[in-house]
A protein has these predicted regions:
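Core dinuclear metal-dependent hydrolase active-site scaffold
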Residues: 17, 120-146
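Conserved beta-strand hairpin/beta-sheet module of binuclear metal-dependent hydrolase folds
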Residues: 1-39, 143-155
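Residue-level marker for buried hydrophobic side chains located in beta-strands
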Residues: 22-24, 47, 71, 150-152, ...
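Divalent-metal (often Zn2+) His-rich catalytic cores of metallo-beta-lactamase-fold enzymes
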Residues: 182-230
Length: 275
């Protein structure tokens, strides 16, 4: 696990160097200077769980730097790597134009010929089995390492920052789908992984326990948001963090799961369900 030291903080965004130049989710380009020159060999493939900037934002910059680099991503996410205009507009609405460069750095397009589109139907690539696991994002996939049994789950198993056991489900807009997420947790469980490899942050050595934790938290948060009381939801979310984590870790939890975004994603989910 490479700690990308996003915004100068440890334990927020991890990039997984698996083997032989394979990287799962390189993170944002704003954090690349913290780690890219320390690699023993050039990366040859990026395995993206999804295209959100905290996971995949550096892809275009890395492809430009390493001429043999291939990028694997779900077929629904591939067009947005090639032309990131819509992705950037969506992120700018969420974070504000004044914060985009500080948070994420350059988001460069990836040439189409360098992208391999995946279906997530159980195909095997680069020693991984790939399963489509929507819920956090419609194009999210999980990679099961067929050698180690580790499952690289992106955001599907939640945010859990050591040394604390608190699990938060990241639910930013616009594509959160609670029903799909719950189904995807069953898909991940069915892979019978040895460990879950989390982007935020580290490893979950007891996969079923972690999946149960994110399932419970997701259902609880969704129910709170459905009541329509934004202030009550945000108060409960903030209090949960502060009751468990020390102040330094609490900052990291909020960096990985900005509370207002968690409300916005679930509020949009319920609103669209009712349309």
């Amino acid at each position: 696990l490479i700690d990308t030291m996003h915004l100068g903080r440890d334990r927020v965004i991890g990039a997984h160097l698996v083997r032989d130049g394979l990287i799962v989710d390189p993170g944002p380009s704003s954090a690349l200077p913290n780690w890219i020159d320390e690699l023993d060999e050039p990366p040859r493939a990026l395995m993206l769980t999804h295209i959100h900037l905290d996971h995949a934002g550096a892809s275009g910059v890395l492809v430009r730097r390493y001429e043999d680099l291939t990028v694997y991503v779900h077929e629904a996410g591939a067009p947005h790597l090639v032309d990131p205009e819509k992705l950037l507009k969506s992120a700018t609405r969420l974070y504000g134009e004044e914060n985009m460069n500080r948070l994420w750095g350059e988001v460069a397009p990836v040439p189409a010929e360098r992208v391999v589109a995946l279906t997530g139907s159980g195909e095997e690539v680069e020693g991984f089995r790939v399963e489509h696991t929507p819920g956090h994002a419609s194009h999210h996939v999980t990679y099961l390492d067929l050698g180690s049994g580790d499952a690289f789950v992106g955001d599907m198993a939640g945010v859990r920052i050591p040394p604390y056991d608190l699990t938060l489900p990241p639910t930013p807009p616009p594509e959160v789908d609670v029903e799909a997420w719950l189904h995807s947790l069953e898909t991940i469980s069915g892979l019978e992984p040895e460990r879950l490899r989390l982007t935020h942050f580290g490893d979950a050595a007891e996969p079923e326990r972690q999946l149960d934790a994110v399932r419970e938290a997701l259902q609880r948060n969704a129910a709170l948001v459905r009541r329509g009381d934004r202030e009550a939801f945000l108060d409960a979310f903030e209090r949960e963090i502060d009751d468990i984590a020390d102040p330094e870790t609490a900052v990291r939890l909020r960096q990985a799961t900005p509370p207002e975004q968690q409300w916005l994603g679930l509020e949009r989910y319920w609103r669209k369900r009712e349309e």
